[in-house]
Amino acid sequence: MRLEARDISFKYGKGTRQILDHVNLTVEPGESVGIMAPSGYGKTTLCKILAGYERPDSGEVLVDGMPVLELRGYCPVQMVWQHPELSVNPKRRLSTVLEEGDWTFENPSERARIDAGLGIRDDCKDRFPVEVSGGELQRFCIARALGRRTELLIADEMTTMLDLITQGQIWDFVLKELKRREMGMIAVSHSPELLEKVCDRVVRL
């Protein structure tokens, strides 16, 4: 799947500074692109626009030539946020969080494989988000984003809040999954070392 952002501009309301100013970005099928910029330069805002969560003031995002805002049903562009507790319903059990993604795999072993790869424990699935650690919750959010029809993953500081061992485990699995499924990725991080390791190229805003 090819994703193209054309001439994206955005600011939060009148009288505020321009967050994004005529940004262009293309991600080819199966390509991994890193995004770097200082804090406050619109990295997360751009990610939300690319995933269809925000509407730009001008410009457009195309997914295989179709505007992302016109897509219906499951969006092939899925985003994992830095703070997992802000992206889940606290009143829903974690098994339901998984079901929010496109988890209708024809072969049940696919779901089990992703659970195992991310270290998701069965005994956690009946719990609520507040009953697990941040690292455990982020594993569920990543699994949710890796639905059957996901073709591009946006990882916005996906492992920043996790310890180094957990970061390594998660990135090891995600990179293997991207290669296995020929998925693309946009990764946001303040760490140039991480982006150089996990991406094909790095873009600075």
Residue ranges and their predicted role:
Residues 66-78, 86, 92:
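ABC ATPase NBD coupling module
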Residues 188-190:
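H-loop/switch region of ABC-family ATPase nucleotide-binding domains
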Residues 51:
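Helix-to-loop junction immediately C-terminal to a conserved catalytic motif
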Residues 142, 154, 170:
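Hydrophobic anchor residue at the start of the ABC signature
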Residues 128-132, 136:
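Conserved ABC ATPase signature
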Residues 83, 90-106:
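Q-loop/switch helix immediately C-terminal to the Walker
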Residues 2-5, 9-22:
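A short, flexible loop at the N-terminus of ABC-type nucleotide-binding domains that lies
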